[in-house]
Amino acid sequence: MIIFKALPFVLLTYSISAFSSVTDDDFDRCSQFLNKIVASSNANLIKELKVDRGLIKADVDSISSNDITAKVQFNKMQSTDTPGEGFLLWMKYDYVNFNLEDVTIDPDNPEQLKFDNRYASVYFSCLNKKVIYKVNGDSRLQFYKDDKLSTPETGVFILPGEYVEVERKSGSASYVKYQAKNGVVYSSWVDSSRIQKFSPEAIKN
C-alpha cells in the first residue's frame, strides 16, 4: 500500500491543463460535494447556531481561476419577505489546492477553515469529469497488498458510502486511491464487487 501524507492527491494525478476544461455545468453537476465541504467545516456560525449540516448549501456566486466564491445558507424555504433568512457566510474555496476560507467580514483578511478532506478530491474529480466510485454493501471494505486479494492490509479499510478513484483493474480486483478525512491518501487493492460507479446527477440537493 502507498500512503501520501498531507499532499492533495489531485496534484499527483492531473496535469495543470486539466483545470481549464471545467465548465459552469460541471460546477452545477458537482454542487453536492461543495455543499459537503462547507457543511463539514469549522465555520464559527455553523457551530454556534447548531445548524443541521444536511441543509447547508453553497450557492456559487463567482469563479476566478481556481477560486470559487459562494454564498452559504441553510434555509431552503426562503421567501420574498425574508430574503436573507438562513444566510450563514460567504466562503472562498480553491478547488485545486483544497483551501477553504471564510470571507464574510474581511475578504482581504479571510479566516482559514478546516473541513473534511474526503470530499475535496471527490469534488475535484467530479469537476474534471473523472469517474467516481462509491463503496457499497454494509461492511467495511478491506484493503489488500496484492491483486489476488490474498494478503489484507492490517487495520486499513474504507467504510460503506465512501468515495474512491480507480486507477486500474486486474481480474476481480481494483487498485484505488482513497483520501481520508485528515487528508492522507491511501492506495491499494480492493474487491471490485464492493465499488460501483456513482453519478452526481442521481442526487437531488
Name what the model sees in each region.
Residues 157-193:
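SH3/SH3-like beta-barrel superfamily modules
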Residues 75, 141-146:
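Core beta-strand residues in small-molecule sensory/regulatory alpha/beta domains
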Residues 147-153:
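Short alpha-helix capping/helix-loop boundary micro-motifs
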Residues 53-96:
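Exposed beta-strand-loop-beta-strand "reactive/processing" segments of non-cytosolic proteins
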Residues 21-59, 127-131, 147:
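Short, non-transmembrane alpha-helical segments in secretory-pathway proteins
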Residues 1-7:
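Bacterial N-terminal signal peptides that target proteins for export
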Residues 101-129, 190-205:
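C-terminal partner/receptor-binding element of secreted or periplasmic proteins
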